[in-house]
């Protein structure tokens, strides 16, 4: 009888151990699944945010290209000289805004700035300008703009009044009749914050 009790107890212990192991495995699998689901959701959100941002700044530049084209068409009809047409376009672009703080800049193919908020940079050559990391961002912006459908450029710069660099993303496109590259862009901290959450999410779920 005593031996039977020992065998029963042994069996119960084995069953309990197996049950605990099974529960632990279920917890690990569940946690991993939650982490995967969370990361997949963040992937979708991040991709949507990046796509939406890219579409917005590209659409804004395309609108300005259309403005330049309409002015150039009037030049071709003899309403303006070429210099007058370029000045009219530059003056209008300088005043354009979108969103909270969106604006546009214009540079010639050789890097001479035509439009930048009316500040002292206008009229100077910034082809060799570099960002905080030493990246020649203006060369990249101009080269991207001269592609058939324009292009995007990522670089880093401190916000006004700050010393720490923040990521920026620009879209630029050429308007060949004037020999210009038009661009706009903005800081992308909000999108990068989603990427950071993506990287830290598994750890948070496992705690």
Residue ranges of model-derived segments:
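Extracytoplasmic/periplasmic sensor domains and loops in membrane signaling proteins
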Residues: 79, 83-91, 120-160
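Short N-terminal helix-loop-first-beta-strand/juxtamembrane motif that initiates sensory/input modules
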Residues: 94-113, 150-151
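Conserved small/polar residues in nucleotide/adenosyl-binding loops
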Residues: 197-203
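Extreme N-terminal signal-anchor transmembrane helix of membrane signaling/transducer proteins, especially
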Residues: 6-37
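Juxtamembrane membrane-water interface segments immediately C-terminal to a transmembrane helix
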Residues: 31-65, 76, 83
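N-terminal sensory and localization modules of signal-transduction and trafficking proteins
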Residues: 2, 37-38, 72, 79, ...
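Extracytoplasmic
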Residues: 116, 136-194
């Amino acid at each position: 009888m005593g031996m039977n009790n020992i065998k029963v107890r042994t069996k119960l212990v084995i069953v309990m151990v197996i049950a605990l192991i099974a529960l632990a495995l279920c917890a690990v699998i569940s946690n991993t699944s939650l982490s995967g689901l969370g990361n997949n959701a963040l992937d979708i959100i991040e991709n949507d945010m990046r796509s939406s941002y890219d579409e917005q700044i590209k659409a804004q530049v395309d609108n300005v290209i259309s403005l330049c084209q309409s002015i150039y068409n009037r030049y071709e009809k003899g309403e303006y000289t070429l210099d007058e047409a370029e000045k009219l376009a530059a003056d209008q672009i300088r005043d354009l805004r979108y969103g909270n703080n969106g604006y546009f800049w214009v540079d010639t193919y050789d890097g001479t700035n035509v439009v930048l908020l009316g500040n002292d940079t206008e009229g100077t050559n910034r082809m060799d300008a570099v960002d905080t990391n030493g990246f020649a961002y203006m060369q990249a912006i101009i080269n991207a703009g001269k592609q058939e459908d324009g292009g995007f450029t990522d670089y880093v710069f401190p916000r006004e009044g700050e010393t720490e660099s923040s990521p920026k993303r620009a879209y630029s496109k050429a308007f060949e009749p004037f020999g210009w590259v038009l661009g706009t862009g903005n800081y992308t901290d909000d999108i990068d914050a989603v990427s950071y959450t993506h990287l830290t999410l598994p750890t948070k779920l496992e705690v």
